[in-house]
Regions:
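A glycine-rich dinucleotide-binding beta-alpha-beta segment and adjacent secondary-structure elements
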Residues: 139-155, 368-424
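General small-molecule cofactor/ligand-binding pocket signal
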Residues: 47-49, 198-200, 378
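Mid-domain catalytic core of redox enzymes
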Residues: 176, 206-320
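Helical element adjacent to the flavin cofactor pocket in flavoenzyme catalytic cores
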Residues: 164-219
Length: 424
């Protein structure tokens, strides 16, 4: 059917929704993602719409809203207006974020300037520890992690380097993709085809076939064999290893990969608005019900949802009003575990009622932040960690796959090269 994994979109009653990649960063001229788009020859097929540079992310905490502005000077100036006594600390914070990002050859595309020592240090120190050392205002320290749903950070676990990469990536510039993220998948397919490649849909890889030393083919749909020189898998590492029934992968490696913790799953409500009722939001909104963005993944039936991320879909052309939007909150796989093993659309009335109740609860919270929004929604649709598991194969229905934990160090890392020389 469709290609592109989480780049895919879906439509219901004429309304279009994105499933995964809702906005991108560092896509202005000369920036990292723009360079990659040009290299992949997709830049001319994709139309970007820049989010508000004065507040591309808005964090709502304890009844106040805080805007993240694009660019170092603008970001520091904006935050200093909220926290005048923290200016010097904000400069120190931002310079550290830049230093870590620039020291990554992958993040900066500047291999000669890579510096692994600083990244090694901040891969072993938690976000809250480092920010707590630099920022003396506890509220500002919380605001700076207000966008942590973008990477499902956990208190005392997620390394500061992860935070630095995300902050730098989006703070350089932030854009939505006009017409939907599936245009990226289509553009990538066009590039592959221009160079003589084929893009195959409805072809599920069921096995990576190896001889005594290397991969020689992939089996598709349990029957068709496609010979290969190289295999590059973008599936979850656990799913990839399941395809490799070979002694070339050591049992101890399989065990380590299977034991890596996963990021939390998500519950998503896709919103179809009534025509010309909801003004288009040119920013992302992070709302919190308690006094901190931390620990939203630790909830009870009564306290859920502790936080949410709310965004609008960017239609083609200039739009004054939004047609669709999305609201996302954390959800643990255990909440839907009893329906595991059922198929999409056939999970039963109990599952549908579970989703309806969760959606209404999440919409009630959204109404607190945007009064009147509930009456402007004509239809909505939902997804759970089970949906992620079924459509993407991500372990435990996690939003971002493997989690990073400073206490596990290298045990959390997955090498891009396997012991099979032509499998990545």
């Amino acid at each position: 059917t469709q290609i592109g994994g989480c780049l895919q979109c879906f439509s219901r009653y004429g309304a279009k929704f994105e499933t995964g990649m809702h906005f991108i960063g560092s896509a202005a001229e000369g920036q990292t993602l723009r360079k990659l788009m040009k290299y992949l020859e997709i830049d001319n097929e994709i139309t970007l719409s820049q989010l508000d540079p004065h507040g591309y992310d808005v964090v709502a905490l304890q009844g106040k809203q805080y805007k993240f502005a694009n660019g170092k000077d603008a970001f520091i100036q904006q935050m200093t207006e909220y926290f005048p006594h923290q200016h010097d600390n904000l400069v120190r914070y931002y310079e550290l974020v830049e230093e870590i990002a620039n020291a990554s050859s992958l993040h900066s595309l500047k291999y000669a300037e890579s510096d692994t020592s600083i990244n090694t240090e901040y891969q072993l120190r938690s976000i809250n520890e480092v920010i707590g050392e630099i920022i003396s205002d506890s509220t500002l320290a919380k605001v700076l992690v207000g966008n942590l749903p973008l990477y499902a950070a956990e208190l005392d676990k997620t390394p500061f380097s992860t935070h630095a990469f995300i902050m730098d990536f989006y703070n350089q510039s932030a854009f939505r993709i006009q017409g939907g993220s599936d245009t990226v998948a289509t553009a990538l397919a066009h590039t592959i085809q221009r160079y003589g490649g084929d893009v195959l849909a409805r072809k599920k890889v069921t096995k990576i076939v190896c001889d005594d030393t290397r991969a020689v083919a992939v089996e598709v749909n349990d029957k068709v064999m496609i010979p290969c020189d190289y295999v590059i898998s973008d599936a979850h590492p656990i799913r990839t290893l399941e395809l490799l029934d070979t002694k070339l992968i050591r049992p101890v490696f399989r065990k380590r990969i299977n034991q890596i913790p996963q990021t939390v799953g998500g519950f998503t409500v896709y919103l179809h608005f009534k025509d010309n009722t909801v003004p288009y939001l040119n920013y992302n909104y992070y709302g919190y019900q308690e006094d901190t963005p931390w620990n939203c993944e630790k909830y009870t039936e009564e306290t859920w949802p502790k936080g949410f991320l709310y965004m609008h879909f960017c239609p083609k052309g200039e739009a004054k009003y939004a047609s669709t939007g999305v609201i996302l909150s954390y959800m643990q796989m255990k909440d839907v575990e009893k329906w595991k093993g059922t198929s999409v659309g056939r999970r039963g009335k109990d599952y549908e009622e579970f989703k309806r109740l969760k959606a209404e609860k999440l919409l009630a919270v959204l109404e607190q932040h945007f009064p009147g929004i509930r009456n402007n929604i004509c239809k909505y649709y939902t997804s759970t960690p089970l949906t992620y598991l079924n459509y993407t194969g991500t372990e435990g229905g996690s939003m971002y796959g493997n989690a990073k934990d400073i206490h596990m160090g290298a045990a959390c890392r997955v090498p891009q090269r396997t012991r099979i020389p032509n499998v990545y």
